[in-house]
């Protein structure tokens, strides 16, 4: 069975890197620029680079926001990346706009720490909190690439799939609920570890996308 992937194009995503990563794994994705484009896709990727409020405004301009909320409420497959993860939450300290609210909780600025810089930029190992379609606790510890100044704080800790150390705290690196998940890091820029995660996600989709509870 063929898989129809869509990458949401709202002017703030690293579409080229995501597209190339999918191509290396033998998949093609169409750009989703408005509600009509959703009719032809089975699974979505919401990438994002930049700031929260401009991203929400750009999404609103596409007319996609109510449709993405419906997509999430119907538990259809969606993967957020970096800012894409933050947009799935209810709000962010970075701005005043409402997020998509597919995950309960808020996005908060990273706390300053003597041995860490903001933005948190570079490679870091993940701690697996629960198994999900991208990551399994039996996997070797993956090192992945981060660039962020804010991190999500889920209201329900059961959606935490992975964390990463920042200073003396563990910050959200991945969330998952049902068929909807997101990474704060960039799997498309995380070399073999990131490619393995995307490959596992694609395999999960091809196998019917069993929800994770």
From Swiss-Prot:
Gene3D superfamilies: 3.40.50.880
Pathway terms, separated by semicolons: Amino-acid biosynthesis; L-histidine biosynthesis; L-histidine from 5-phospho-alpha-D-ribose 1-diphosphate: step 5/9
Entry GO terms, CC: cytoplasm
Reaction(s) catalysed by this chain's protein: 5-[(5-phospho-1-deoxy-D-ribulos-1-ylimino)methylamino]-1-(5-phospho-beta-D-ribosyl)imidazole-4-carboxamide + L-glutamine = D-erythro-1-(imidazol-4-yl)glycerol 3-phosphate + 5-amino-1-(5-phospho-beta-D-ribosyl)imidazole-4-carboxamide + L-glutamate + H(+); L-glutamine + H2O = L-glutamate + NH4(+)
GO molecular function annotation: glutaminase activity; imidazoleglycerol-phosphate synthase activity; lyase activity
CDD domains: GATase1_IGP_Synthase (cd01748)
Keyword Hydrolase tagged: yes
Keyword presence, Hydrolase: yes
Assembly and binders: Heterodimer of HisH and HisF.
Protein's UniProt name: Imidazole glycerol phosphate synthase subunit HisH
UniProt source species: Synechococcus sp. (strain CC9902)
Taxonomic path: Bacteria, Bacillati, Cyanobacteriota, Cyanophyceae, Synechococcales
Gene name as annotated: hisH
